[in-house]
């Protein structure tokens, strides 16, 4: 795994700090809207995915791709964006989708 150069960490810190603020506004705009729920598991078991999961992941991916176009992105809902970069972003747009579905505010995003 590559080492982030000492002077580069500020770029990532600033980006993630701004992304967190943008995500808060984006999530807040979506919370009062209805969403569709489907089961990712076909057959046995239940693993919900919502239209919000997909919208949030698209939003996060777009921000990362705009700032770091060569970085690899691995997302729970849309898989990998392959790249030759040594840098990878891993996204779970709604960690705690079951809680999100029932209106329990104990969910978050993971980047």
Functional labels for PLM-detected ranges:
Residues 1-94:
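N-terminal subdomain of lithium-sensitive/metallo-dependent phosphomonoesterases centered on the IMPase/IPPase/PAP
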Residues 83-111:
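DPxDG-like acidic metal-binding loop motif
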């Amino acid at each position: 795994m590559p080492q982030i150069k000492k002077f580069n960490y500020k770029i990532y810190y600033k980006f993630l700090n701004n992304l967190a603020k943008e995500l808060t506004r984006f999530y807040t705009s979506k919370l009062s809207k209805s969403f569709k729920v489907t089961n990712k598991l076909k057959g046995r078991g239940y693993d919900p995915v919502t239209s919000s999961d997909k919208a949030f992941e698209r939003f996060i991916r777009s921000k990362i791709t705009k700032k770091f176009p060569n970085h690899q992105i691995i997302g729970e809902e849309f898989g990998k964006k392959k790249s030759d970069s040594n840098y990878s972003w891993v996204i779970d747009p709604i960690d705690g989708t079951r809680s999100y579905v029932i209106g329990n505010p104990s969910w978050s995003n993971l980047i």
